[in-house]
Amino acid sequence: NRPNNKVSVMGNPTLGEVKTIMIGVRNNARATKSVEVWANELRLQEYSNDGGWAAQGTLNIQFSDLGSVNLTGHMETAGFGGIEDKVSERNQEDMYNYSITTSFELGKLLPEKVRFTAPIYYSFNKEVIKPKYNPLDTDMLLEDALDACTTEHEKDSLRSLTTTETTNKNFSLSNVKFNIATPKHPMPYDPANFSFSYSHSESNKTGETTAWETEKNWNGAFNYNYSPEYKPFEPFKKMIKSKSKWWDIIRDQNFNYLPQNISFNANILRNYYEYQERDIENLEDPTSLPLSFSKEFLWNRDFSLKWDLTKNLHFSFNSATHAEIEEPNVPVNKDLYADQYQVWKDSVWHSIKGFGTPLDYQQDFTASYKVPLEKIPCFSWMSLDGN
């Protein structure tokens, strides 16, 4: 009966977070009164039913046998969703994503007689998510909040705070080598025995509660592999003329004066992670909260030797060293901590010169011998071996 009466709510609540409403009735009179209170259903009307749209495109370019380039793009706007999705299940943000992927064989740029191979790979991906409503005031459109900013600095700060950006980069060179070897008899110094690989990946993310989150990985590998080709030395083959099988055990003896394979691998791996949480109450200083970081710097080396001294006598030796490149426990951020970065750099170089600090060392040696009983007629039905 009193339509002009108003009920006010103190503060600036977010309607989307209202879970409970309590109604209280107070009797200020001294007399006892009996009342009946009706609370009708409370609901929001005229729900926004604005639709959105999405698009996706792909472009693939092939450069003969040199390589290829692939471009992709994808975007969705607020309000986009499936046909069967409810209004509340549709997108509440604009999403933009694009990527580029390239793969080339650099060896194709050189004459074929050089016999150089260098497969190179690079990829870049970026995703931007822009909410429809201001996360700091979820009843207000973000565009309206940006229009309410009085300076460009305020607009840039609000965009940085409300927009989530994720960037990924990857680069790799795999098994780079010159496939040049000495004909018939490969030599230890042939370029084909050496190969090199390198990869680097980086991920960056910013958002409402994240000033920055960065992870970087490096991996460098060097490989040496030599397998000589030669005829074994058979000193008794021409010396014994008899064709009797009783002489086979001596006549067929041979000696390999070089090992069958020698290999050496060195692998350096480094990982660095850095996370800076955003201080909502102090946006002017992104480093007001403590910086979180973790890192790992390893240098792994292994050696392998396989030598069949004769047809029946086999040797193998393997060793592996896992070492850590020591570094001070400080953030590795040249822009924010220039002095600490120089200390870190000096410490790392000093550790590399000393081949790192060994964490563990493993080695094993195996030998096996098969008695050539098949060369003795009366024992050809038997076998005997040991290792």
Give the role of each language-model region:
Residues 1-32:
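Extracellular beta-strand ligand-recognition surfaces/modules
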